[in-house]
């Protein structure tokens, strides 16, 4: 691929057997540090799920080493160019599972999963009338961007998705089901779970939103907004043909694609808001969070009690 920027961000996963995740994680961290990569990699007995950043040379060495390991034969790396690192540190952590579903009877995607649809086929399937499109991500990811007509499950974490489906099964009955997520890993299990639940026509977007946005044929069409990513970039573009902002400012409802975390560390909720509203509302999602003694915005900007009181008065006056 033609390279114009000095850094890359790699996104990848693979369901494969790793006998001793703890030992592998420790050795892999050492290896990543030796290459000076930064990122977050999860390791489980069922495989690996990672995203990391480094220079072109560093990421090439990493991909070469992974491809030379028979456990990761056929692994696919999704590559984004970047101006610098997308992470502050390097973490490699063992986990009970790669994506947290916590099912009593776990899903093995090698044994049961939905049909894979390449971007063009997924694009065509979305336009069919008897199709229902389910976003398998969290609510804050959906709020920043999603496929036109996609259903937003009212969930804050992936493990809540099966219960939501059971409670809303009338939406899916008799329909062709399409599922999608950022890179594909969540849908491998989620679509498999749907098949096991008895849904007959279940498909998943192969390679996820990231692959869809890079596909030269579809060019991200039918996607509105941006794609939430779990690194310092926060959002990446998908639709190369038109950019429609779907995110709404938490405070005013105006179009917005800027995420911040609520300044109250006990809340830490992700909220969309402009720089102006961040300052006006002390980066807090509610009055309770604004007056929290641990409000990070207040501490960071060394605001006095008088300044905080004035800000609260201004908010009250504007209601």
From Swiss-Prot:
EC supergroup of this enzyme: oxidoreductase
The family this protein is said to belong to: Belongs to the TrhO family.
One GO biological process term: tRNA modification
Catalytic activity, reaction form: uridine(34) in tRNA + AH2 + O2 = 5-hydroxyuridine(34) in tRNA + A + H2O
Main function: Catalyzes oxygen-dependent 5-hydroxyuridine (ho5U) modification at position 34 in tRNAs.
NCBIfam families the UniProt entry points to: PRK00142.1-3
Superkingdom of origin: Bacteria
Record-given protein name: tRNA uridine(34) hydroxylase
GO molecular function: oxidoreductase activity, acting on paired donors, with incorporation or reduction of molecular oxygen
Catalytic site: 181 (cysteine persulfide intermediate)
EC number(s) stated in the UniProt entry for this protein: 1.14.-.-
Pfam families named among the record's database cross-references: Rhodanese (PF00581), Rhodanese_C (PF12368), UPF0176_N (PF17773)
Keywords recorded for this protein, A-Z: Oxidoreductase, tRNA processing
Domain Rhodanese per the UniProt entry, residue ranges: 127-221
């Amino acid at each position: 691929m033609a390279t114009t920027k000095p850094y890359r961000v790699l996104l990848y996963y693979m369901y494969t057997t790793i006998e001793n995740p703890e030992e592998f994680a420790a050795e892999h961290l050492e290896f990543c540090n030796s290459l000076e990569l930064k990122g977050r990699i999860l390791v489980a007995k069922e495989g690996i799920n990672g995203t990391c950043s480094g220079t072109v040379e560093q990421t090439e060495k990493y991909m070469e080493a992974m491809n030379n390991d028979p456990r990761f034969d056929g692994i696919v790396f999704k590559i984004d160019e970047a101006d610098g690192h997308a992470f502050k540190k390097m973490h490699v952590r063992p986990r009970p599972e790669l994506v947290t579903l916590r099912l009593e009877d776990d899903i093995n995607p090698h044994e049961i999963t939905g049909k894979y649809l390449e971007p063009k086929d997924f694009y065509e399937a979305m336009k069919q009338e008897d199709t229902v499109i389910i976003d398998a991500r969290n609510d804050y990811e959906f709020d920043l961007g999603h496929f036109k007509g996609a259903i937003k499950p009212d969930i804050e974490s992936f493990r809540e998705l099966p219960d939501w489906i059971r409670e809303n099964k009338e939406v899916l009955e008799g329909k062709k089901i399409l599922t999608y997520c950022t890179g594909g890993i969540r849908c491998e299990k989620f679509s498999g779970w749907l098949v096991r639940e008895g849904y007959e026509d279940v498909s998943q977007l192969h390679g996820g939103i990231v692959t869809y946005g890079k596909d030269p044929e579809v060019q991200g069409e039918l996607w509105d907004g941006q794609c939430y990513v779990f690194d310092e970039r926060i959002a990446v573009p998908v639709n190369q043909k038109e950019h429609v902002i779907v995110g709404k400012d938490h405070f005013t409802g105006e179009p917005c694609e800027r995420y911040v975390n609520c300044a109250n560390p006990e809340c830490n909720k992700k909220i969309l808001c402009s720089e102006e509203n961040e300052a006006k509302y002390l980066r807090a999602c509610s009055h309770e969070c604004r007056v929290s003694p641990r409000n990070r915005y207040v501490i960071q900007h060394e605001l006095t009690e008088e300044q905080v009181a004035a800000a609260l008065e201004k908010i009250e006056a504007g209601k």
